[in-house]
Curated annotation (Swiss-Prot):
<keyword id="KW-0808">Transferase</keyword>
<dbReference type="GO" id="GO:0002939">
    <property type="term" value="P:tRNA N1-guanine methylation"/>
</dbReference>
<feature type="binding site">
    <location>
        <begin position="133"/>
        <end position="138"/>
    </location>
    <ligand>
        <name>S-adenosyl-L-methionine</name>
    </ligand>
</feature>
<keyword id="KW-0963">Cytoplasm</keyword>
<dbReference type="Pfam" id="PF01746">
    <property type="entry name" value="tRNA_m1G_MT"/>
</dbReference>
<protein>
    <recommendedName>
        <fullName>tRNA (guanine-N(1)-)-methyltransferase</fullName>
        <ecNumber>2.1.1.228</ecNumber>
    </recommendedName>
</protein>
<comment type="function">
    <text>Specifically methylates guanosine-37 in various tRNAs.</text>
</comment>
<comment type="subunit">
    <text>Homodimer.</text>
</comment>
<dbReference type="InterPro" id="IPR029026">
    <property type="entry name" value="tRNA_m1G_MTases_N"/>
</dbReference>
<keyword id="KW-0489">Methyltransferase</keyword>
<dbReference type="InterPro" id="IPR029028">
    <property type="entry name" value="Alpha/beta_knot_MTases"/>
</dbReference>
<comment type="similarity">
    <text>Belongs to the RNA methyltransferase TrmD family.</text>
</comment>
<dbReference type="InterPro" id="IPR016009">
    <property type="entry name" value="tRNA_MeTrfase_TRMD/TRM10"/>
</dbReference>
<dbReference type="InterPro" id="IPR002649">
    <property type="entry name" value="tRNA_m1G_MeTrfase_TrmD"/>
</dbReference>
<keyword id="KW-0819">tRNA processing</keyword>
<dbReference type="InterPro" id="IPR023148">
    <property type="entry name" value="tRNA_m1G_MeTrfase_C_sf"/>
</dbReference>
<dbReference type="GO" id="GO:0052906">
    <property type="term" value="F:tRNA (guanine(37)-N1)-methyltransferase activity"/>
</dbReference>
Length: 244
């Protein structure tokens, strides 16, 4: 996979892209990450990438020319049209399902904005997706693009050493992940549940499944709204409700 990030602040990505999973993914050649300063594409004699909004108002608006030119340059040798994703608080809420969808693409371009916003022609004629990572305000789209990049890249084949850990992650199964414990079995009187030390894998799997359901019901009940619960999950959920 190829991921290009269009930004005015490329230095922000050095630490994130040069460590942990993203670093390993690049070393394994599972992904090619490029950070591009779209100011390099401006034709303005003052090297500017923004201007005052027509009709007046506060703030500056990113002009279309440098962003259009940057995307066109990055895709001039690409046979398949890439997904061009605008980081935008008005966009579709980012979810695990969206991450899985994007992980199936060959080429992604993330556009990170600043200032008051983007010229609307960028939205209408250039991008394929607009994505938001939450209902809050950030200084720019850089942090959002880092979050999405990490979420997508870890899904690529061969990136994670243990495929099972990826499958069991919160949201991957539609439920929040079950609790985890490690040594010691008794820490200051706080004990690990007996079932986890029983060696009975069937009972352990059932405990983890039920605890995932419990945690989801308690912390994110909205995730259960569209879930087609199995007969066993319905039984467990009734037990969980009685235990509350």
């Amino acid at each position: 996979m190829k991921i290009d990030i269009l930004t005015l602040f490329p230095d922000m990505f050095t630490g994130v892209f040069g460590s942990s999973i993203l670093k390993k993914a690049q070393e394994k050649e599972a992904v090619n990450l490029r950070v591009v300063n779209f100011r390099d594409y401006t034709t303005s004699k003052h090297n500017s990438v923004d201007d005052y909004p027509y009709g007046g108002g506060a703030g500056m608006v990113l002009t279309p020319q440098p962003i259009f030119d940057a995307v066109e340059d990055l895709t001039k040798e690409t046979e398949r049209k890439p997904r061009v994703v605008l980081m935008c608080p008005q966009g579709e809420r980012f979810t695990q399902k969206k991450a899985e969808e994007l992980a199936g693409e060959e080429h992604l371009i993330f556009v990170c904005g600043h200032y008051e916003g983007y010229d609307e022609r960028i939205r209408e004629h250039l991008v394929t997706d607009e994505i938001s990572i939450g209902d809050y305000v950030l200084t720019g789209g850089e942090l959002a693009s880092m979050v999405i990049t990490d979420s997508v890249v870890r899904l690529l084949p061969g990136v994670l050493g243990n495929h099972a850990s990826q499958v069991e992650d919160s949201f991957s199964t539609g439920l929040l992940e079950h609790p985890h414990y490690t040594r010691p079995a008794d820490f200051r009187g706080m004990k690990v549940p007996d079932v986890l030390m029983s060696g009975n894998h069937k009972n352990i799997d059932e405990w983890r499944h039920k605890e995932s359901l419990r945690r989801t019901y308690t912390r994110r009940p909205d995730l259960l709204d569209d879930r087609d619960l199995s007969k066993q999950e319905k039984k467990w959920l009734e037990e969980i409700k009685r235990e509350q």
